């Protein structure tokens, strides 16, 4: 599915207000890790994989995805999700949406795919912050973060990932820990438990009276240096 989404086209739809992901962190980041799988737009390769799995245009794979109509950090969820839905259809994946309110979606994310609130969904689309190793990777890949402990909605994890996480947690020098986290990130991208759609760039409108604002690569803004004329 990661091969089916034309992210350049999506960026055009959003007026340039997104960055194209190659994983949870970008190439050049200390946690990048140089994964073997390249997240890209390659419909022919995706169709080949789907055909090998027994699917076709006349026999598509059907899946339900829980999404929200609005909400914190969701960018433009309805047009974006509909764009992805159309993209996946070219790769023999027929997506049905279960559209729910943002706070309900966020709660469902915590209780997991096996809960009745999932309403039979096979996936959930929730934006997330990647500000530290736990938020970025661990909570989605550890067998110790299965619901309701944390946000491993799809119960993804195994002994290999638990070992990679333990290696990072038990390494206390910065370079060694970054190397361990890079190995974890590389394996996450290679196993692809997510479809990486977009990095939010946090567009905002500011009054000319506001000074010393620094745009972070995050949703979280440091207001301490900001002044107003």
State each model region's role.
Residues 27-28, 102-103, 202:
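Conserved beta-strand edge residues that scaffold enzyme active sites
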Residues 2-86, 90-91, 155-160, 176, ...:
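Append "and occasionally in soluble cytosolic enzymes with long acidic Gly/Pro-rich linkers
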Residues 89-146, 180:
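Periplasmic binding protein-like
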Residues 1, 65, 88, 109, ...:
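Hydrophobic, well-ordered secondary-structure elements that form the walls
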Residues 4, 140, 187:
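Conserved catalytic core of Hanks-type protein kinase domains
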Residues 32, 71-75, 104-106, 129-133, ...:
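Flexible loop/turn segments at secondary-structure boundaries
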Residues 30-45, 55-61, 110-117, 138-166, ...:
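Short, solvent-exposed loop/beta-turn-alpha elements that line the ligand-binding surface or hinge
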Residues 12-15, 53-72, 116-126, 171-208:
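Bilobed periplasmic-binding protein-like "clamshell/Venus-flytrap" ligand-binding domains
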């Amino acid at each position: 599915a990661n091969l089916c989404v034309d992210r350049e086209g999506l960026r055009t739809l959003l007026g340039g207000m997104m960055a194209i992901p190659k994983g949870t962190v970008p190439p050049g980041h200390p946690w990048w890790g140089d994964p073997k799988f390249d997240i890209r737009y390659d419909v022919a390769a995706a169709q080949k994989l789907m055909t090998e799995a027994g699917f076709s245009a006349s026999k598509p794979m059907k899946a339900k995805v829980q999404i929200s109509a609005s909400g914190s950090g969701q960018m433009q969820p309805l047009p974006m999700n509909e764009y992805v839905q159309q993209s996946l259809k070219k790769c023999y994946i027929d997506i049905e949406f279960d559209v729910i309110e943002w706070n309900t979606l966020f709660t469902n994310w915590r209780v997991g795919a096996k809960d009745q609130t999932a309403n039979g969904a096979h996936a959930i689309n929730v934006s997330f912050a990647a500000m530290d190793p736990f938020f970025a990777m661990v909570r989605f890949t550890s067998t110790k973060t299965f619901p309701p402990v944390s946000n491993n909605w799809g119960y993804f994890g195994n002994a290999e990932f638990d070992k990679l996480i333990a290696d990072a947690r038990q390494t206390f020098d910065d370079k060694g820990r970054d190397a361990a986290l890079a190995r974890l990130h590389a394996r996450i991208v290679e196993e692809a438990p997510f479809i990486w759609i977009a990095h939010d760039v946090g567009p905002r409108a500011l009054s000319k009276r506001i000074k010393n604002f620094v745009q972070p690569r995050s949703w979280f803004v440091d207001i301490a240096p900001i002044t107003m004329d």
